[in-house]
């Protein structure tokens, strides 16, 4: 082999190994690239109990319960499926029924979600794109002009 042929062979083999490595990394990360799963996604994909995921959707109206010892129970819904969530801790200030939420944790054996972290959306009008897409898929999207929950009091009151 000439020097030029060895260099070309080395480059071709190196590019092949690099492409294989990138492919393996992307394959391994295929499930962790998703920011969160909607309740419908959890049911459709058959998420295993104990598998850590992020569950996102809307906090179902009337589902918030204060349990003893700082435990809180509420339902997360995308209007097609609903998953009960149990959380122990202090909820974010922006957390309330009818608003978007992302929870981190795992399903237990009964299909309930045990959260160890709860993230609330930024303001009354923000909705994560994934939640909006899930609402559109289920036919519950009310459009850009729809009034946000509790919007009659938004902007009223005194601020420091």
UniProtKB/Swiss-Prot annotation:
One of its GO terms (cellular component) is plasma membrane. Residues 29-160 are periplasmic. PANTHER family: CYTOCHROME C-TYPE BIOGENESIS PROTEIN CCME HOMOLOG, MITOCHONDRIAL. Residues 141-160 are annotated as: Disordered. Heme binds at residues 122, 126. It is a single-pass type II membrane protein. Heme chaperone required for the biogenesis of c-type cytochromes. Transiently binds heme delivered by CcmC and transfers the heme to apo-cytochromes in a process facilitated by CcmF and CcmH. The chain crosses the membrane at residues 8-28. GO terms for biological process: cytochrome complex assembly. GO terms for molecular function: heme binding; metal ion binding. Its main location: membrane. This is Cytochrome c-type biogenesis protein CcmE. It is found in: Cell inner membrane. Belongs to the CcmE/CycJ family. Keywords: Cell inner membrane, Cell membrane, Cytochrome c-type biogenesis, Heme, Iron, Membrane, Metal-binding, Signal-anchor, Transmembrane, Transmembrane helix. SUPFAM superfamilies: Heme chaperone CcmE (SSF82093). Residues 1-7 are cytoplasmic.
